[in-house]
Amino acid sequence: MYSDKKNILQLVALLEAHGITKVVLCPGSRNAPIVHTLSTHPGFTCYAMTDERSAGYFAIGLALNGGHPAAVCCTSGTALLNLHPAVAEAYYQNIPLVVISADRPAAWIGQMAGQTLPQPGVFQTLVKKSVNLPEIQTEEDEWYCNRLVNEALLETNHHGKGPVHINIPISEPLFQFTVESLPEVRVITRYQGLNVYDRDYNDLIERLNRYQKRMIIVGQMNLIYLFEKRHTKLLYKHFVWLTEHIGNQTVPGIPVKNFDAALYAMPEEKTGQMTPELLITYGGHVVSKRLKKYLRQHPPKEHWHVSADGEVVDLYGSLTTVIEMDPFEFLEKIAPLLDNRVPEYPRVWENYCKTIPEPEFGYSEMSAIGALIKALPESCALHLANSSVIRYAQLYQVPSTIEVCCNRGTSGIEGSLSTAVGYAAGSDKLNFIVIGDLSFFYDMNALWNINVRPNLRILLLNNGGGEIFHTLPGLDMSGTSHKYITAVHKTSAKGWAEERGFLYQRVENEEQLAEAMKTFTQPEAMEQPVLMEVFSNKNKDARILKDYYHQLKQK
């Protein structure tokens, strides 16, 4: 029988799955549940050692002899510090050593409890990875614990070998051994490049061709990649391709971009048909919360993430494989190896998303964004600020010749204007930025800048506060919290824009918007930068948006 502590069960199951079966066990009470579970399991070869200093070096010997990682497990407190010399040796000798330390719960560190000291990160730069496991209470805790253990174990042999540290807080009671078997756990594997002569490579292609419902999601990418026509034809027909405007030209063929609205409108009985069996991802951040929620609630059987750095990124909670290589090289490598069967799944998604109409909003900040996108000149740069702007822009089709930029690394409201000004300063094309009032006024010193050029045009959406907060489900602002949450204001950019040499346009209705947009989007160079300030009512904007989504549900 094994310990009932779920974080211990995850750890032991993953040690076995990753082939780490030689473990040095040191005495103690806090680590007794770990020791009992490891020593009871027939898949592990356990070695008893009393002195942690010697135990660490003994484990190094085990790892050196077999070439595979070995583990050493100790109790809490100074027992862990006694492993420090061995950890240093393993680091500088590039030996895959897994240090497992039991710990008190975080609440008792520094409270005069016995055998306690701050254990997470204690080895600092002498380990390749250090993780502190959660005590599992929820499904999210279990996913997090599983991911952390996978990350640590994968790092023992990633860009060279070396030691890692796994710290496990364990609450009392400690000695409840009531579990009969280890759980089935998700094992994350990593391929460092794909070589056609590797056996593992063949297994990957076999798994790829096993699935008929294959989806590729492309996150933010600030580049253009033109696939060869032969690869485009092969890749496009075998996968559903989803991306957003910030994915830019990094997809073979024409991707589905209105999936967020499609997911909102999708009836529950259709979700099974639309859920992928295999999900492949590359690129950076994805904006759509609906897509993340959908794939977390309806996980694929496998999720492969392809990136040059090979980091474990589990956005959808179902990651099974990390492929460390350039994503475009990966796609072109697998293209000729796809089987000849053309699945129906991509057409199912495309046909469904074609039924979602592009919105026709009344005068609002959404209609202003739509008016700009429809009037943009070819081959310009479009900068989208965060919060509502980046989301509303996704409701419209942006021509593929237009480069789309957005600060989605941290998705904050600060710096969007400064980034666009800096980009335009080094650009030879027109640069348009769409920005909300809070983002603009927060970053207004971006215009206090001698490097602002005439190729910059700013569409400022001013509805007197943070409109997006009016659309958040479950947020009740009927009381006094309204003015604090939405940052209500009565500020205009007119004086500041004119002071900084901008041509200023004020818009308060649909007719003025249409007229001002002609000047704002003219492709010819102008003598000064332009700022168009569109005023709207945030309550009305929120109502118009809710009505649009309500109509989608009625389809």
UniProtKB/Swiss-Prot annotation:
PANTHER family: 2-SUCCINYL-5-ENOLPYRUVYL-6-HYDROXY-3-CYCLOHEXENE-1-CARBOXYLATE SYNTHASE, PROTEIN PHYLLO, CHLOROPLASTIC. CDD domains: TPP_PYR_MenD, TPP_SHCHC_synthase. Its EC number is 2.2.1.9. Catalyzes the thiamine diphosphate-dependent decarboxylation of 2-oxoglutarate and the subsequent addition of the resulting succinic semialdehyde-thiamine pyrophosphate anion to isochorismate to yield 2-succinyl-5-enolpyruvyl-6-hydroxy-3-cyclohexene-1-carboxylate (SEPHCHC). The keyword Isomerase does not apply. Pathway: Quinol/quinone metabolism; 1,4-dihydroxy-2-naphthoate biosynthesis; 1,4-dihydroxy-2-naphthoate from chorismate: step 2/7; Quinol/quinone metabolism; menaquinone biosynthesis. It catalyses: isochorismate + 2-oxoglutarate + H(+) = 5-enolpyruvoyl-6-hydroxy-2-succinyl-cyclohex-3-ene-1-carboxylate + CO2. GO terms for molecular function: 2-succinyl-5-enolpyruvyl-6-hydroxy-3-cyclohexene-1-carboxylic-acid synthase activity; magnesium ion binding; manganese ion binding; thiamine pyrophosphate binding. It holds the Pfam family TPP_enzyme_M_2. This is 2-succinyl-5-enolpyruvyl-6-hydroxy-3-cyclohexene-1-carboxylate synthase. Binds 1 thiamine pyrophosphate per subunit. Gene3D superfamilies: 3.40.50.970, TPP-binding domain. SUPFAM superfamilies: Thiamin diphosphate-binding fold (THDP-binding). The gene is menD. The keyword Aminoacyl-tRNA synthetase does not apply. It comes from Bacteroides thetaiotaomicron (strain ATCC 29148 / DSM 2079 / JCM 5827 / CCUG 10774 / NCTC 10582 / VPI-5482 / E50). Belongs to the TPP enzyme family. MenD subfamily. The lineage of its organism: Bacteria, Pseudomonadati, Bacteroidota, Bacteroidia, Bacteroidales.
